[in-house]
Amino acid sequence: DFQIEFIKNVIDPSTITFVIQTKYLYQIVSNDNGIDVDRMDYIMRDTKMTGLNYGVEHMRIMDNTVVEDNELKYDAKCKIPIESFFTTRYILYKEICYHKTVVSIEHHIKDILKEIDEQFSITKCVREEDWEQYISLTDNIISYIDFIPDKKLTRAKEILNDISERNILKLVGEIISDKELDIVSPNKNIVIIKTKIKYHNKELPKFVNDKKVKTLLNENVLRPVEHITKIMCKYTDNEEANALFESYL
């Protein structure tokens, strides 16, 4: 019971006292500087599984991590591996997570989930915190939709078939800005998908043994957040969608 409560507190600290007394333990799992085991895990796994040819020197970073003033800091000699870590994460989000095809299929899957919500009680599971039922909602749902003859699933089947045949939303244009754009369209055939990508996280990593290098550059500046607005439509020759994109050029 103690270990379970401890793990829960590390993931989501319930008291300020816990954070102050064991801040470095919390940082191992979720660090405001963006360097933690959770991010290392998915960056290494996702780059390998998607064939993205970028590596992370995770062992060098971990071997040069120290606890000082009750928080995690890093030896200055692993500045480059840490910068490479941030760069790889940035590329992963740009090229994989927010790729036009990925966000398009995600949008269609959301539509499928809306269509089957009543049959599978998805919203009800979350509202009533019925997590046993919730975790039973696996990818098998797709097979169920595909093979079970149920008129209530007709629209979900159509969307699933569109995904299979790549009859999905196409990218009309992408706008990158330093703040979120207030862009909407009353046309239901035009979909606006907004995301944001951080290079750094909430704060910069802190280094030790940094006395041999003097820099006149301002390194204490977080890279700005990129706000990405994708204008998507099933048909890229949609005049209204193209006009909406062109209006931002």
Locations of the language-model features?
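Histidine-centered, transition-metal-coordinating active-site segments
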Residues: F2-L249
